[in-house]
């Protein structure tokens, strides 16, 4: 059974500030500033040296923390048109060489496995772009060989999603594999943070409204495109970090193959009996499903979207492209930030985040 949130806290600014004594909402709202700081740090790290390189493979490393979410999002953004093979793995493969590019992120300066991977990749001549703290074994393994982008803004562990994504996208831009306007990305993240500011009440605050929709439910985060599904993975990560909600994440076609869960979703979004008494339910107490259909790419005629709209008429559709004019990477980042702030609002209201219970990686 999930913790019950105090919904009234979300619009009581004084109590919300008191609950957020660690300044977690402010840390999350620095996403746009992270993009700008990372852009400057990447230039100083010498990412331009990747220009003109035609890599044999791009290796995306998924170490614990943000690594899996970042890697899968970058892969999803690249996959439609990228001519270079993408490898998503927990450790750098033994076959990497001078024609390969390795992208890695960690909040843990003492990640021994990553340190060994970075050392091996650099020794074999691979081009390594690493986003990590500038002290500790991981940074030491990169010294003089890898391109180390150390975060310039101090945020708690797990709050550097914008830094990690920006670092990877800038590396891909240098390789000529992806186009990203970092300044526009930062500006849109600033706008989203402003829309979601604690001073705005729930009915005009997208993150608070999302938090209230998720409260006391089991979120089914079903993507209508690969990028949206990747953002759903990150949403599940932040919800598990700041709340005790358990989510299901899948692309919609895959979700349809989960027949029992999909049937429950159909029932939950079809209206049902609005006069039904929940006390008449004979079975174990359970949080009802809340179906959120996520869309990043603007494809109104897409088969998945049409099928989902017909099958799940009452599902919530969250599509940033219908709210802002931006590219896929920016829409994905905006959606990710909204989920992060929603998770924080929900966690603060339920008392499941803040204080000593937050994740802290091992120190060097």
Regions found by a protein language model. Name each.
Residues 73-86, 237-246, 310-314:
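Short helix-loop-beta junction
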Residues 85-91, 132, 245-257, 315-326:
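A generic structural motif
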Residues 1-43, 126-134, 138-146, 170, ...:
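Phosphate-moiety recognition in structured ligand-binding domains
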Residues 70, 160-167, 231, 235, ...:
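Catalytic-loop motifs flanking and including active-site residues across diverse enzymes
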Residues 45, 52-194, 296:
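Glycine-rich phosphate-binding loops that contact phosphosugars or nucleotide phosphates
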Residues 73, 98, 257-266, 338:
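N-terminal beta-loop-helix "entrance" segment that forms/cooperates
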Residues 28, 71, 75, 114, ...:
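Short, highly selective alpha-helical patches that border small-molecule cofactor pockets
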Residues 20-30, 37-48, 53, 173-281:
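Active-site phosphate/pyrophosphate-binding segments
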């Amino acid at each position: 059974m999930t913790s019950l949130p105090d919904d009234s806290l979300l619009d009581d600014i004084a109590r919300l500030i008191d609950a957020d004594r660690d300044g977690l909402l402010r840390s999350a709202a620095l996403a746009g500033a992270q993009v700008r700081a990372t852009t400057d740090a990447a230039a100083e790290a010498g990412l331009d040296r990747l220009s003109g390189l035609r890599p044999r493979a791009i290796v995306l490393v998924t170490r614990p923390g943000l690594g899996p979410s970042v890697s899968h999002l970058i892969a999803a953004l690249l996959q439609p048109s990228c001519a270079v093979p993408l490898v998503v793995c927990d450790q750098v493969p033994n076959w990497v060489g001078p024609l390969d590019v390795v992208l890695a992120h960690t909040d843990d300066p003492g990640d021994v496995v990553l340190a060994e991977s970075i050392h091996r990749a650099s020794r074999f001549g691979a081009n390594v772009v690493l986003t990590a703290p500038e002290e500790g074994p991981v940074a030491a393994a990169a010294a003089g060989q890898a391109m180390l982008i150390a975060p310039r803004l101090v945020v708690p562990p797990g709050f550097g999603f914008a830094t990690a994504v920006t670092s990877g996208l800038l590396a891909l831009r240098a390789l000529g594999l992806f186009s990203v306007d970092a300044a526009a990305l930062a500006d849109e993240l600033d706008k989203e943070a402003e829309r979601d500011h604690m001073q705005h009440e729930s009915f005009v605050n997208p993150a608070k409204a999302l938090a209230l929709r998720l409260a006391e439910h089991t979120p089914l985060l079903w993507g209508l495109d690969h990028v949206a599904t990747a953002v759903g993975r990150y949403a599940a990560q932040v919800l598990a970090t700041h709340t005790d909600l358990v989510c299901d994440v899948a692309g919609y076609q895959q979700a349809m193959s989960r027949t029992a869960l999909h049937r429950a979703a159909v029932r939950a979004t079809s209206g049902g009996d609005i006069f039904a008494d929940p006390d008449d339910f004979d079975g174990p107490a359970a949080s009802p499903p809340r179906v959120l259909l996520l869309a990043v790419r603007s494809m109104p005629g897409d088969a998945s979207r049409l099928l989902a709209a017909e099958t799940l008429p009452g599902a919530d559709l969250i599509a940033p492209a219908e709210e802002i004019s931006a590219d896929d990477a920016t829409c994905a980042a905006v959606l990710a930030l909204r989920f992060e702030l929603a998770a924080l609002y929900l966690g603060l209201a339920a008392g499941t985040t803040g204080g000593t219970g937050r994740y802290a990686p091992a120190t060097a």
